[in-house]
Amino acid sequence: MVLVVDYGSQYSRLITRRIRENEVYSEVVFPDDKVDLSKVDTVILSGGPRSVYEEDAPKLPEWFQEYKGPVLAICYGMQLIVKELGGEVRRGRGEYGRTLVELSRDPIFEGIPEKVHVWMSHGDEVVRLPEGFHPIAVSETGVIAAATDGKRFWLLQFHPEVHHTEYGDRMISNFLFNVCKLEKNWKIGDLVEEKIRHIKETIGNKKAILALSGGVDSSVAAVLVHRAIGKNLVCVFVDHGLLRKNEREEVERVFKEHFDMNLVVVDARKRFLEKLRGVTDPEKKRKIIGEEFIRVFEEEAKKHDVEFLVQGTIYSDVIESAASGKTTAKIKSHHNVGGLPEKMNLKLVEPLRDLFKDEVRKVGKYLGIPDRIINRHPFPGPGLAVRVLGEVTEEKLEILREADYIFIETLRKHDYYDKVWQAFAVLLPIKSVGVKGDARAYEYVVALRAVNSVEGMTADWSRIPHDILDEAARRITREVKGVGRVVYDITSKPPATIEWE
């Protein structure tokens, strides 16, 4: 296993992803976490926002003295190793963004041109290497960009894990296979069979319950656990009235008919809309929906003799939750059932907690889940309630449902749905003047939103061809009663979030 020690870098998860893309297993830990070194083949120290000379700056983990294997240290990690081994780091002019570096011959740079552009993000710089180290890359400003002792330590001042670094993927694979001599051991088929065995051992002949949303994570978790315990898994699908068009019918068709699951559908549309009446604040809407969802789920769970709660938590959720108390601030409340295990005295099973989203999709494909489910765009837990800006009403939901359906249908028609990470419609709380026939119209405005992203942490607005947008806009204004204007959102994240609320 490759262990990535996270020093607060926004790119730490990317390091783990790049390693797994090479079919080598990797996990993220924090410097103060306990580690079983018997399972560790290689350690990577991430970057971070701190200076190694700050009084409370993160240090090397306690277990690091016992670890004797190869180390790749990136950015802050490089500076930390240099300082700890007797070199010198000091405040420099800083290098940020795309930077040209000149590489020397080294196994980590095999097959890479002598000069490449890399992604820098550092204020401190190494001015003297520890004894036994030599530089293997220098930046255009003369700063040491990489160094090694040729035995155990490889230090990179830049970030090979980001796409902005040319040949970054090659550098990581060179380190894994040329330097560390690791073997590829991260196979989806073996992984799935091992997870099924583990679920059987954990749950046995007992019953488990799962809140099925129809999204990728809960769907894959449901099929995986169903493969292990069959009808002893009770899947609860709550129709809160905030779903996309035909969503409930599709979930019933796939999971009840195709997979023959024990699926319970709860029609709670009236109670959710009643709770949301008059509410306009997005944070209040999210909170109301989350709390009401838990009430509905609890009521249903009491009808079944269950001991386990299955959740579709994935690895990015685990890392963000672990980090949230350390460095991150809350942007939005996330609608989930995280409080249910304690409230209901259920044992928690999270079969996907060590997988990233793309790996979850691979597991889903292996399990035979239809591509239409596997490749679905992300959908917020509060559903259309956070895409109807302002108060949520049945009329507004129906307008948005139809507009969103037309937008997605148009993207699919032109084979563009899978080219964007997420696409949806938003109903704005304003009306605008228009002309329909010979009469004046005063109708709602719909905003279309489409973004490209990897994990949703950052996102760029999608450059959808104008003829596709034109077709969607014409259909929406023609076919959806109450809509007189369509606009396209061209804001990236940051500064905006992907969802409007």
From Swiss-Prot:
Transmembrane segments: none annotated. Its EC number is 6.3.5.2. Disulfide bonds: none annotated. It catalyses: XMP + L-glutamine + ATP + H2O = GMP + L-glutamate + AMP + diphosphate + 2 H(+). It holds the Pfam family GMP_synt_C. Residues 186-376 form the GMPS ATP-PPase domain. The active site is at C75 (nucleophile), H159, E161. Pathway: Purine metabolism; GMP biosynthesis; GMP from XMP (L-Gln route): step 1/1. SUPFAM superfamilies: Adenine nucleotide alpha hydrolases-like (SSF52402), Class I glutamine amidotransferase-like (SSF52317), GMP synthetase C-terminal dimerisation domain (SSF54810). GO terms for cellular component: cytosol. GO terms for molecular function: ATP binding; GMP synthase activity. InterPro entries: Arginosuc_syn_N, Class_I_gatase-like, GATASE, GMP_synth_C, GMP_synth_GATase, GMP_synthase, GMPS_ATP_PPase_dom, Rossmann-like_a/b/a_fold. Catalyzes the synthesis of GMP from XMP. PANTHER family: GMP SYNTHASE [GLUTAMINE-HYDROLYZING], GMP SYNTHASE-RELATED. NCBIfam families: guaA_Cterm, guaA_Nterm, PRK00074.1. This is GMP synthase [glutamine-hydrolyzing]. It comes from Thermotoga petrophila (strain ATCC BAA-488 / DSM 13995 / JCM 10881 / RKU-1).
